[in-house]
Amino acid sequence: MAKKITGYIKLQVPAGKANPAPPIGPALGQHGVNIMEFCKAFNAKTQADEGTITPVVITVYADRSFTFVTKTPPASVLIKKALGIESGSSVPNKNKVGKLTKAQVQEIASKKMPDLNAASLEAAMKTIEGTARSMGVEIV
């Protein structure tokens, strides 16, 4: 018989840097999950992407056990990484902070594809382009 699910926890944690401090500790603590066990498992699974913000969905069961699924980093993080910038523009329609080529957009879209609600790579590329435009990045 399947285990009874008592809750889901969604967090964005830097890859390889999970620790019991807030926000992870309190979120897991209120569900009775072993915090150190999660931190060790998460850090082991994400050590290749060290430092990149990684969304994670933790499923907590009635017996206080858990499973977790890591997602791909947010599109904005991937765009900033591709351009080597700290943050997007505060006035995106006036100040442009960089230029993204179609090839870079395609690479980011193919990386994000499993987590995007897009039927094709072209649709995923349009989603990424929209995110880039809202950050003040020009598509060339």
Curated annotation (Swiss-Prot):
Family, according to the entry, reads as follows: Belongs to the universal ribosomal protein uL11 family.
Q: How is it modified after translation?
A: One or more lysine residues are methylated.
Function, please?
Forms part of the ribosomal stalk which helps the ribosome interact with GTP-bound translation factors.
Q: Which CDD domains match?
A: Ribosomal_L11
Would you tell me the protein name for this molecule? Large ribosomal subunit protein uL11
- Could you state one GO biological process linked to this protein? translation
Q: What GO molecular functions are on record for this protein?
A: large ribosomal subunit rRNA binding; structural constituent of ribosome
> Which InterPro entries does UniProt cross-reference here?
Ribosomal_uL11, Ribosomal_uL11_bac-typ, Ribosomal_uL11_C, Ribosomal_uL11_C_sf, Ribosomal_uL11_N, Ribosomal_uL11_N_sf
**What are the alphabetically sorted keywords of the record?**
Methylation, Ribonucleoprotein, Ribosomal protein, RNA-binding, rRNA-binding
